[in-house]
Amino acid sequence: MSVGVREHLVSTASPYQQIDVYDTFELGKMLFLDGHVQLSTRDEYAYHECLVHIPLLALRDPKIALVVGGGDGGILRELVKHPELDRIDMVEIDDLVIGECRRHLPELSDGAFDDPRVKLTIEDAFGFVKNANSVYDLVVLDVTDVYEDEEGELSEKLFTKEFYDDVAKILSPNGMVVTQADNLVFCPYSLQDIKASFAESFPKVGSFWGLVPSFGGFSGFAWASLGADIPQFWPGSRAQDLRLRYLNELTYRLAISPAPFTSPGS
């Protein structure tokens, strides 16, 4: 996929990664980390709505959520739409990502960082989760992909059994953890591998998918829990005040249907 660039808004390096923001003709503003697409303002809402609302609407009386990564603020924007949440913790290792996104992509967070329920911690999420004393009803893992041909990647240890075991320890009995699982067409193994890893730490595992054109079309998501499940019906009454742009009864039913371009059971 190629796009025309109107302006290169940001090119800077943090201690952790290269950060670039482009204004493009076809996909609006786009965020790249270490040269990899993270989002475009043309379709980011599809990704963020799926990652937040599909699991959160499945939970009974959720009160506390944790966001791992998500420095662009899109996950926070969707979480703060839920008045039933009393607290939203966020741990992000790279504060420069947050700063550049708040400056050049303010529509992503839409003021969510200033919500009084949000507590932001700048720290390595691996250590944060291992030492956490809180119990969370929802844990959203919005971390960068791991690429086989790149060594020492920032988020690599956030895809390990040790990390998932630690997440299980801070998850409420009726809670859920959810993560992005890459592109179903070009990286179908990613969803399969994450679900297999989840299954070593959680008794219940599943997946759903959404259409995100800037990610190559079909994006996978994996979830795990100690008992909670994703309902087969659209929770319309709970969703009616969430100002959703992508999710509705039709796209929800598609999301929870068998994922395309993957083997049966994925």
Which stretches of residues belong to each language-model region?
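SAM/dcSAM-binding transferase cores
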Residues: 1-20, 217-266
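Glycine-rich, charged/polar anion/phosphate-binding loops
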Residues: 4-7, 17, 125-127, 206-210
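Short, well-ordered coil/turn elements that cap or connect secondary structure elements
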Residues: 113-115, 172, 199-202, 239-241
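Flexible loop/turn segments at secondary-structure boundaries
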Residues: 148, 185-186, 214-216, 231
